[in-house]
Swiss-Prot record:
GO cellular component: cytosol
Species of provenance: Caulobacter vibrioides (strain NA1000 / CB15N)
Entry's family note: Belongs to the RutC family.
Gene Ontology molecular functions: deaminase activity
Gene Ontology BP terms: nitrogen utilization; uracil catabolic process
Keyword Hydrolase carried by entry: yes
Protein name as it appears in the record: 3-aminoacrylate deaminase RutC
Catalytic activity: (Z)-3-aminoacrylate + H2O + H(+) = 3-oxopropanoate + NH4(+)
Matching HAMAP family: RutC (MF_00831)
Role played: Involved in pyrimidine catabolism. Catalyzes the deamination of 3-aminoacrylate to malonic semialdehyde, a reaction that can also occur spontaneously. RutC may facilitate the reaction and modulate the metabolic fitness, rather than catalyzing essential functions.
Origin organism lineage: Bacteria, Pseudomonadati, Pseudomonadota, Alphaproteobacteria, Caulobacterales
Length: 129
């Protein structure tokens, strides 16, 4: 099964050794995605709504580059630094998944830099939903 690295046009070089996404057998695996600004610093420090929107736009870009849509997302892995961010994250999340909702889980944990409050990784099945 061949694997294709998915890097949307204009994507910044990741600060760690990973690809924004990979496509294999019609399945897109989107790496854990954080809200970085153009200089690879934390965008919108502490703002769960703004970070969630940027994260989901980045995920959408990866999935669309692979030939899919957000309707193809079947699973989301959500990481929050504090449960206080749960409601603001869900407010934005619902905008991106208005119909049938993907499976997901959400856990509280530390993230790689202070100021990040939301990280999401996704799986999408292109053309199979």
């Amino acid at each position: 099964m061949p694997k294709t690295v998915i890097t949307p046009p204009g994507t910044q070089t990741p600060i760690a050794p990973f690809s924004p996404g990979t496509l294999a057998d019609g399945i897109v695996y989107v790496s854990g995605t954080l809200a970085f600004d153009k200089d690879n610093n934390v965008a919108f420090p502490g703002d769960a709504e703004a970070q969630t929107r940027q994260v989901l736009e980045t995920i959408k870009s990866v999935i669309e580059t692979a030939g899919g849509t957000m309707e193809d997302v079947t699973m989301n892995h959500i990481f929050l630094t504090d449960w206080v961010h749960y409601a603001p994250m869900n407010k934005v999340y619902a905008e991106y998944f208005p119909g049938d909702k993907p499976a997901r889980y959400c856990i509280q944990c530390g993230l790689v830099k202070p100021g990040f409050v939301v990280e999401i990784a996704s799986v999408a099945h292109i053309g199979k939903t």
